[in-house]
Amino acid sequence: MDICRLCLRGVSGAQMCLQIFDVDSGESKVAEVLRQHFWFEVLPNDEISKVICNVCWTQVSEFHQFYVSIQEAQVIYATTSKFKQDPEMVNTSWPEEVLMPADVLAVDNDVGAQINVNPLDELDLSQPMSPEDSKVGIKTERQSPDMELLFEDANNEQDEDYEDDEDDDTDDLIVTRSGRKRKRDVAKPAKTKRGTVSVGRKGKEKMVVKRGPPKRIFKMERLPPFCKEDEELIKRYIVMGCELCIFLAEDFDGIREHFKDKHPDERPYIKCCGRKLNKRCLIQEHARRHENPEYIKCKDCGKVFANSSVLRAHWLVHHVPDEECDFQCEDCGKRFSRRNLLELHKGSHVPVNERKFICPQCPKHNAFATEYHMQVHISMQHRKAANICHVCGKKIKDKAVFEKHVRLHFEESGPRIKCPRPDCESWLKDEDNLKQHLRRHNDEGKLFICSECGKSCKNSRALIGHKRYSHSNVIYTCEQCGKTFKKDISLKEHMAQHTGEPLYKCPFCPRTFNSNANMHSHKKKMHPVEWDIWRKTKTGSSQKVLPSAQVAQMFRDDADVAAIANDYSG
C-alpha cells in the first residue's frame, strides 16, 4: 500500500493519489511547489514515498495559488505610480462597499488592482515567480482541522474578525498584520471587473470589493481543549498501544515519548479500525465516531465519512451551489468550486479515439485524456491488490465490502427490508442496499438525457449503464469462436458453454445453469412459492455461484455414479 509523502497515511481504494515525479523525466511541478512551502525536500529516490494523496494536494494547491495571488498583488503595489487625492471625495461614504481584508481577497491577472497595505507589512519579494505560478488566482477559505462540522455565512465570520469602530462614524479602520489600526483613505473609485479601485491620500490604490450575497462555506467550529470527558472517551474505545512492539501507554503523550525513545525514525501513531492516527485531534475525532457512528455526516445528503477531510472534499464536489462555483467548463457549462475539479472534468469531453494515454497494466488497454487521469486510474485500480473470497473466489477491492461479503457466507443476514415508497414492491437485503436503491427513484424529478442519442433515463446510474452498453467501443471477444459481447459477464457465461462447467446453482433444487437469467427464470416458474417467500423473509443469497473446485467435485461424483450404474448393468 502506498502512503502519502505529506500526511504519511495509507492511500485507501477510495482515495486518489498523485505521482510527485514524472516517471520518464524525473521532473515535477508538484515537487517544486512542495519545495517552496515545506521545510523538507522530496527527492526522486525518496525512501518514504513518491506519491501525495488528493486531499493533501488539494490543500497545498489552494494555498500555493493563494500565495501566488498575494505575491502578484505585492508586485503590483511596489510598481504602481503615484496619484493625487481628490479632496471632494475625502468624506464620501460607500454603504454598499467594504474594504476586504488582505487574507481573503482574490486577485485576478486581468484586473489592475492594488491592495492598500502598510509598506512595513510587505512580503519578501526577493523570490522570483515562475511562469506557471503567475497563471493562477483563486479564492481560498481558512480551514481549522478536526472540528465539528457546520455551515455558516462567510460574511459573519469577517464581521467578527474585522469590527468597525462604533464611535467613529466617518473614518473606517484597517487592521494591519502587525496589529496596528489606521484610517482608511477614501477617494474617487475606478471601476474594474472584480470591484472598485479607490485612490488614497498618498496616491496608493486599494481594492474595494462590493459585498455580494452571502456564501455558504464549509466551516469547522473549533472544539474546546482536551478535557476529562475526551480522555475517558478515548480510553473507552481506543487502546494506546504501539504496533511496532509490545507497549501500552496511558495516553498519546506516552506514545510520543515511547516512539522518541524506541522508534526515533518513525512518526508517533496508534492504530484503530485499520487506520493510523498520528495526531491527538484525529484520535479525538475517531473516538467520537465510536461513540456516534454518524458524527461525521454530510448535512446535505446524509452520507457518513471516516474523517472530516474527506467530508470537506465531498462537500466541495457535490454540494456547493452553482452560483458560488467560480470555474465553468467551456464545453458543457458545468460549474465547479475548485480549478482542479474543473481540470479533472475536462478529460470527459475528449473523444475516446483521441485519448492517447494508455494504461500499461489494464488488459482492456483503457485510454485516458491526460496522464493525470491515467495516474488516478492506476492508483485506484492497480496499486491495491484485490481481496479474494476463499469461499466463492469473488474479487472485491473495497475492504469493508469484502468483509461484509465473507460474513454472509457464514452468518445469516437480517430480514429483508421493503422499500418505503408505496409504488415500489422491492425488498432489499440490508440498509446499505436500501439507501442505494432509494437513489434510483429520482424524487427530485431530474431529467437524465443521453448526449449521444437523446434517450431519457430514470436516474444517473441508468444513464451511465446505457452509455457504457450502447455507446462504448469496449467489446469482449471469445477466443474460441470469435463471438463478441458488450459485457464481461456475458463473455463469462458464454465461455461456460464451451467448457461445460456450470456457473450457478438453484438454491431450491440441485439444478445448475450457465446463465444467471436462465436460473432466475427457472426459480420463478418452478419454485414460485419459495421464490416469493425468499423475496420477503429469507436471508442470504438468492443464487449460488459455484466455485471451480465444487464444479470439479460434481463432475467426479457424476462419473462415479455412472461407473456404478455400468457395473450393475453389466
UniProtKB/Swiss-Prot annotation:
Residues 149-172 have a biased composition (Acidic residues). Residues 178-194 have a biased composition (Basic residues). Zn(2+) binds at C4, C7, C53, C56. Residues 120-206 are annotated as: Disordered. Residues 2-80 form the ZAD domain. GO terms for molecular function: cis-regulatory region sequence-specific DNA binding; DNA-binding transcription factor activity; zinc ion binding. The lineage of its organism: Eukaryota, Metazoa, Ecdysozoa, Arthropoda, Hexapoda. This is Transcription factor grauzone. Transmembrane segments: none annotated. Transcription factor essential for the completion of meiosis in oocytes. Grauzone binds to the promoter region of cort via the zf-AD domain and activates cort expression in ovaries. Present throughout embryogenesis, in larvae, in ovaries and other tissues of adult females, and in adult males. In ovaries, it is expressed in both follicle cells and nurse cells. Expressed from stage 9 in the germarium. Weakly or not expressed in the oocyte nucleus. A zinc finger (C2H2-type) spans 240-263, 296-318, 327-349, 387-409, 417-441, 448-471, 476-498, 504-527. One of its GO terms (cellular component) is nucleus. InterPro entries: TF_Grauzone (IPR039970), Znf_AD (IPR012934), Znf_C2H2_sf (IPR036236), Znf_C2H2_type (IPR013087). It comes from the Eukaryota. The keyword Zinc applies. Homodimer; at the zf-AD. The keyword Zinc applies. Residues 132-145 have a biased composition (Basic and acidic residues). It comes from Drosophila melanogaster (Fruit fly). The gene is grau. Pfam families: zf-AD (PF07776), zf-C2H2 (PF00096), zf-C2H2_4 (PF13894). Changing C298Y: In QQ36; defects in female meiosis. Abolishes DNA-binding activity. It is found in: Nucleus.
